[in-house]
């Protein structure tokens, strides 16, 4: 846990409240290099497509830039609501497509996003890595600090085969970046623990730092990346 478990003052009429149709996503601010700071949570910048997952009344809808019907491109994720121990939730995360060996594959992802499937079927196995929780039990959490939202996310989303919560560390940005470079990941995500979620530029709330992987570039499995082994 990052901090104390989030306790939500849920209103009695929360079951009748509906999730918003769309949410303006927060965008990361670019910085020059990885850094250390006890006020930040560091994790991989996942090589995939940004996606919001809306879970309501046992149904799933997704918001992905450029896709009018994301579920049609990622039908294997239809059962995501069964994994979320929450009703009226919105998750912020990244869509990946894995090859036969379980490695994130940019070309397989591109084909899905372009709708280049055969009779609605696509090669590769999709996965969704959740990084933030914007709504829970029909209540908006965007004014809560990231540390509380992340703790709540870990509590309501147990690990599964296709949908998982990524691993990260507080303070040790340069160490995490070194580990990610060895895994072929070219970006580091840094989220300020005390920051609210706001649409548009994240400024100090969410930063992205570049990482330079070695050549030839490694292509590890998602399972190995999730373990995030630190030297």
What are these regions (language model features)?
Residues 1-231:
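Catalytic cores of nucleic-acid ligases and guanylyltransferases
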